[in-house]
Regions:
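Conserved NTP-binding/hydrolysis module of P-loop NTPases
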Residues: 73-107
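Conserved P-loop NTPase "ATPase switch" module shared by AAA+ and STAND
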Residues: 128-152
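Positively charged, aromatic-enriched patches within helix-turn-helix-type DNA-binding elements
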Residues: 365-368, 377-413, 419-422
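P-loop NTPase Walker A phosphate-binding motif
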Residues: 44-74
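Conserved small helical "lid"/interfacial subdomain of P-loop NTPases
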Residues: 199-228
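A structural micro-motif at secondary-structure boundaries
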Residues: 353-376, 430, 437-443
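Sensor-1/coupling segment of RecA-like P-loop NTPase cores
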Residues: 144, 148, 156-188
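Winged-helix-like regulatory helical subdomains adjacent to P-loop NTPase cores
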Residues: 225-226, 234-317
């Protein structure tokens, strides 16, 4: 990726000037930490948890809350390094981070104890506490530490004890809630897991999405027309990772002369130039999210409807979002991806999702009410999407071998079906003298 493209970020944001948004979450987190409250930050893959932890690790960001040195020392640990470590290695890494932070804060620390022991860690924390400083430990990828089979309930009880003795606070970041990520039930029973306030980290707001484009483009001295930015946000939604992908490919298309940045209006053909590369790069990430869903959740996501617990869980994973009390896909690229998946028990074609067993139909997430005859016609058309289905075959699907002296009965049924599936009735295309087909109306 060329350095001239300001949307190059794919991993964690490490520079303060590149960080965008999350003002509300930051204020809440820092306010809680100032009061010694531990926090469990939960959010799906690539939503920006690591970026947020790195950002608040910067002293000027914490200063307004009096969490800067020497008032408070922040220690950031990446738990990927500790996935299989024994307790001694965890203590030693914590101790090293504390000593570095204490040195930067000009605190005087006596380190006569042997490193790699709980006693050494406790001794240093005691000295820091006596000098009036608080400590916050940031634990990124915390599920790897919590699932470490070398760490017993006693280990986590000791970590909890440090909060009582020295007012130490923890900020953990994980994809799933703490109760779902521990290696054993006995570990979960540790009082350590009862001290956290849970904070979800979700999608950007619309304003934050626009700010991301504005900031990235401004720093690079580049521009994108507002109409193009609006389309990109509609395409990939408000997920910061996918917004970076969209911005990157838009700049590449302009640099390659595939799109004219000076235009005020763009055609569908212009947008299609962007859709391809954006969806190709997003495919593997969407595939990862899909494969990590249970079959039940895949079914619920495909119809954007189902048990409220499943819908809320998919919302927490930033796959669905609630708009006017209705759950909708978080992005157009996600909707297209889901439509390409094979979901047992469902037929997916165009805007329609059909559950044959339950006799239910949805059009772009909205449940439609069809008669048995209308349902049978739509099922047959959706099974052969893009192909012409002969009128005789449609009649057979509805009436079987029953002879009815009404040559217009199929036309009448199709007309009623189009009204029933409005505004998607124009997907049902008449092929004069042959039959009907389900395909996009513009084709």
């Amino acid at each position: 990726m060329g350095v001239d493209n300001p949307f190059f970020h794919r991993g964690a944001i490490r520079h303060v000037e590149d960080f965008v948004g999350r003002e509300a979450e930051l204020a809440q987190m820092l306010g809680l930490l100032r009061n010694g409250q531990s926090i469990s930050l939960i959010g799906p893959r690539r939503i920006g948890k690591s970026s947020l932890l790195l950002y608040i690790g910067n002293t000027p960001i914490r200063a307004p809350f009096q969490l800067d040195p020497p008032h408070s020392l922040f220690v950031l640990l990446d738990c990927q390094e500790l996935a299989g470590s024994p307790p001694e290695e965890v203590y030693e890494l914590l101790l090293d981070g504390l000593l570095d932070a204490a040195t930067q804060a000009n605190l005087t620390i006596d380190t006569t104890e042997q490193p790699g022991t709980y006693r050494a860690l406790d001794r240093v924390l005691q000295q820091i506490y006596q000098q009036g400083s608080s400590v916050v430990v940031l634990l990124d990828e915390f599920e790897l530490l919590a699932a470490n089979q070398h760490l017993t309930p006693y280990f986590f009880a000791r970590l909890r004890g440090l909060t009582t003795k020295y007012g130490l606070a923890y900020l953990t970041a994980s994809q799933r809630p703490l109760f779902a990520i521990t290696a054993e039930e006995t570990v979960l029973s540790s009082p350590f897991f009862n001290i956290f306030v849970t904070m979800p980290l979700g999608l950007f707001t619309e304003a934050e999405a626009h700010e991301l484009f504005h900031r990235r483009l401004e720093r690079a001295g580049q521009t994108l027309p507002q109409g193009l930015i609006a389309y990109l946000i509609k395409l990939v939604g408000l997920h910061p990772f996918f917004l970076h992908i969209a911005g990157y490919h838009a700049i590449q298309a302009i640099n390659n002369g595939e799109i004219d940045a000076s235009l005020d209006h763009y055609t569908e053909a212009d947008f299609q130039v962007l859709d391809g590369p954006i969806e190709v790069e997003a495919e593997s990430h969407l595939g990862y999210l899909w494969q990590n869903l249970s079959p039940e959740d895949q079914h619920v996501l495909a119809i954007a409807d189902g048990p409220i617990e499943s819908l809320r869980q998919l919302e927490q994973q930033c796959l669905l979002q609630k708009v006017d009390n209705t759950y909708v896909y978080s992005s157009e690229i996600l909707r297209r991806f889901v439509r390409r998946q094979d979901v047992p028990g469902l037929i997916q074609a165009g805007p329609f999702v059909i559950d044959e067993q339950r006799h239910q139909v949805w059009g772009n997430g909205r449940e439609l009410s069809l008669t048995t005859s209308q349902f049978s016609i739509l099922v047959r058309l959706c099974r052969h999407v893009g192909q012409v289905v002969r009128g005789e075959d449609l009649e057979m699907a509805v009436w079987g071998d029953v002879l009815v002296d009404d040559p217009d009965r199929l036309k009448t049924l199709i007309k009623r079906l189009r009204r029933a599936v409005d505004p998607f009735g124009n997907w049902i295309i008449s092929e004069r003298g042959v039959g009907y087909a389900l395909r996009p109306p513009e084709e």
